[in-house]
């Protein structure tokens, strides 16, 4: 009997033990897989060093808004959906994900996000199953709306205020905000109004020095990524090689037009085979 009581105590203790959470970067590497049709680095998601801090900020209770003011093809979208996958798996709450158009959203969801869910075990386990087939219920997991077991993710295009009007959400994603009308962004922000705990994740490549992502960046604490200089060892600001100290382009690269796909993504194999300096 004493052994039985001891075993019962241990099992009860497990039920009330605090959950051990892995940091987002480690979680992403263990659970997120990129297919070769969406990344030139297929396999387990290896987060670039400059993307680690934004991912970790998603679980910082003192941070409500994460702004990625990054250059094009710098892993903005990959970083973002790895972070969203983490939040939906570990801290599930209703989410609204807005893109410049409904077509953008539908193509992204169908071509990248849904396959990503299929390869991410924790997120796939949140998908309801059909009683008839035993497979993922395709009536609840659709291109524009995924009704997970613990929360709902809705995609929307920014073409009209009606598209972004939905029930209140805790997570709001604004993808490529420089392509989204400011009035639409304000309407979207109404979806988190009154929430004590919320996250706004917004990304874009800056186009102008006024408005858009650059203005949002200036509103924040303006973090930059520094790396050790390969020559002197001092930490220097990370910048793309094709720009000089004044920010001017030193050279540009051209590649075959068909390397850019209809959904706006790129076929890196075609880029590698056709790229040339100008």
Task: Show the residue positions of the predicted features.
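Phosphate/NTP-binding elements of NTP-utilizing enzymes
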Residues: 1-278
